[in-house]
Amino acid sequence: MGNVSVAVGTAVGIPIAVGVIIALIFWCKLQRRYKKEEIRDADLEKMVMEEVAVSVYDGFKAEINSSSEASTINEKEANQDLKPCQEKTAKAGYTPAYRRQLNASMGTLRPKKQSTAYINVPVIFSGEKVNYGMVRDPSYSFMYPLTLSRKETSSLRSASTSNLSSSTENTALHEEIKLDDPYENDFTNYTVNKREFIDSLRPR
């Protein structure tokens, strides 16, 4: 009886023990394989993360460069668009220095009303002197207000006009017309132009 039980136990126990041992061996191998794969996966993840970080950095850098270039181009275009506008406004709003001074002192230079006559051609009467005002009328570019100061009576003037010699007439015609214009230049030299016009009226 005892031998039968031993034989049955050995016949059943030995294959079970062998199977358990083989299962343990395969389990150990699988565990080692899993560990190796985990280490390999960790290395791969590190490499992938590094590549992703580099690609993201490159893309961000390229985007920054493109945005900076676009901003510089926009600034240049804006400056180019503003230049003609600034030149137009500067040309439209330019006021010469003498005109600013005259406009500022317009009220102080003409405080009193005087009898004025606007003429295009200056006329010098014999025996009289023409006293030109220093303020130019801004609405008429070629007209000046005049103030005629008579030093002689009408009878003396008629006598002097009839008895005036040629030398006196020449001196009267060549008398310099003084314009107290501190802003007179080559383009606004009214004195020379008026003198030439008066010389052209002389009989030859």
From Swiss-Prot:
It is found in: Vacuole membrane. Keywords: Cell cycle, Membrane, Transmembrane, Transmembrane helix, Vacuole. It comes from the Eukaryota. The chain crosses the membrane at residues 6-26. The keyword Cell inner membrane does not apply. Its main location: membrane. One of its GO terms (cellular component) is vacuolar membrane. It is a single-pass membrane protein. Belongs to the SKG1 family. Involved in cell cycle progression and surviving DNA damage. This is Altered inheritance of mitochondria protein 20. It comes from Saccharomyces cerevisiae (strain JAY291). The gene is AIM20.
